[in-house]
């Protein structure tokens, strides 16, 4: 709602449900708002599956990401597609420098994510009163229908012990390897890599196709369902294209259902009762569509002035970069975040 104010994409739907569109004087009623509180936003569904694999999936090797499975190769391909996407959207950091990726694990975009994770760690340590007893393990636990098959539980880094000092707490996180270090001159902590953070604190809790599940079992599949047809639909055009373009490669690997490609293609061709395509509806739901010049909808809505984005940085239901991209896009758009 904070980004889609007065968007024409919603007009047909509002008229269809009989929403008030004009006041008593015949003036158009506006629906833009002043500010938005965003808690763990599940957005950017056009690239959410690719973002999940780039941020988390590429560092996993069990379940649907096990070697020899077609879904492992699909994960790698989605990761590569996300690199392309990042370089297309040309986000800038707060200093005005463009963020790019030179590979799946390198580039200024990667470095910026790493710095965000480090900032969160240092803020947590400075804001927390020690002795400290965590309420849960760092990695959390898979939950819901999206829990990955065969992946097991993520590593329990904190054991619900009480830590007397910040250094004691960091020592527990470094119990199996040293991936967090302290700068003796500044007192700040840094992490060795995004991969280390993911493996210790943010393991993937969903299978490949984290949002547009191959079996159409995720809540997002229901979101794009067509009431008069079936209740769930595929919506990820990146996955649809990969399943079609790389069918010969995937067919040589395990766990491929030959119907996947056809199902994605068929679902993406369906329109709803107002003649809107799945892609149009994905755009409606995507803040980046309105905020970034890569998309046709750039500057087509009245965006709120103020935003606050809150999220659990270690939760495995979505990638860190969805929220990070939203922050950067809003900042690049001139909004207060």
Regions found by a protein language model. Give the residues of each.
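Non-catalytic, alpha-helical, charged scaffold/linker segments
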Residues: 39-41, 47-226
């Amino acid at each position: 709602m904070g980004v889609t104010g007065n968007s024409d994409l919603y007009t047909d739907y509002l008229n269809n449900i009989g929403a008030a569109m004009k006041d008593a004087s015949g003036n158009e009623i506006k629906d833009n708002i002043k500010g938005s509180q965003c808690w763990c936003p599940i957005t950017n569904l056009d690239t959410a599956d690719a973002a999940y694999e780039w941020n988390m999936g590429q560092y996993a090797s069990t379940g649907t990401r096990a070697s020899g499975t077609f879904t492992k190769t699909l994960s790698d391909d989605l990761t590569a597609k996300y690199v392309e996407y990042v370089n297309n959207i040309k986000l800038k950091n707060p200093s005005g420098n463009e963020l790019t990726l030179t590979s799946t694990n390198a580039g200024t975009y990667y470095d910026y994510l790493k710095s965000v994770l480090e900032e969160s760690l240092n803020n947590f340590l400075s804001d927390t009163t020690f002795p400290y007893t965590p309420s849960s393990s760092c990695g959390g636990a898979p939950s819901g229908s999206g829990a990955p098959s065969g992946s097991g539980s993520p590593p329990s880094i904190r054991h619900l012990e009480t830590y007397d000092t910040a250094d004691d707490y960091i020592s527990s996180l470094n119990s199996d390897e040293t991936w967090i270090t302290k700068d003796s001159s500044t007192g700040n902590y840094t992490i060795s890599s995004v991969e280390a953070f993911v493996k210790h604190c943010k393991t993937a809790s969903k299978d490949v196709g984290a949002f547009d599940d191959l079996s159409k079992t995720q809540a997002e599949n229901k979101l794009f369902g067509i009431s008069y047809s079936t209740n769930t639909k595929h919506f990820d055009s990146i996955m649809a294209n990969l399943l079609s373009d790389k069918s010969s490669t995937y067919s040589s690997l395990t766990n491929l259902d030959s119907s996947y490609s056809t199902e994605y293609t068929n679902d993406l061709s369906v329109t709803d009762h107002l003649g809107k395509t799945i892609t149009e509806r994905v755009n409606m739901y995507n803040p980046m569509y309105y905020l970034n010049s890569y998309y046709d909808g750039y500057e087509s809505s009245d965006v709120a002035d103020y935003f606050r984005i809150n999220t659990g940085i270690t939760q495995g239901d979505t990638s860190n970069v969805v929220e990070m991209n939203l922050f950067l896009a809003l900042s690049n758009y001139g909004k207060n975040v």
